[in-house]
Amino acid sequence: MADHQALSAVFFLLLVPHVAWMAMAMPSSTLLHDKCELYAAGDRPSYDYCIRTLRVDSASAAADERGLAAMAIRIARSTAVATAAKIARLQRGETVPARRDGLAACAAEYAAAVRRLGRAARDVSRSRGAAGARELREAQTLLAEVTGAPELCDVAFEVAGGQGSPLDAADRELDVVVGLASDILPTRPMATTKP
């Protein structure tokens, strides 16, 4: 009987931290699901994309609204960096002048997108208290500017010779992840907590 009580006590002690951790993680996990439901607006593939994209960062389960937006922006920045690297590889091998011009225009757009997304992530991370509204507006503006980068890249290829962009899939991916970041971006700064 004493062994059974001791075993029960050990089980209880092991269970308490797990239950406490679950209670702390649940609201943020719910926030992740709530934000993805709003983003998807009833479209299951969009919801799955949102969850899959944000869960790439293991901190997403415990993140607040601002943290989720910053994660989405960092993921968008990584997408833009990868596309910029692809553009650089294509530029090295391109011999047709019109396509080189198109790639040069795309390189400029994606370099600007990388800078803007970096600034947007910093703005969201700093958006606390009364001054935070300005940072959130700036982040929204930067995300809106980045949303146009893929289309400008496509237009550059059309102008350069009427050929389609070799970056269509990458362009669509950037627009989708920037759209996700825009949709989950908080509209108001978080209140600052006093120590």
Mark where each language-model region is.
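Trafficking entry modules
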Residues: 2-140, 145-195
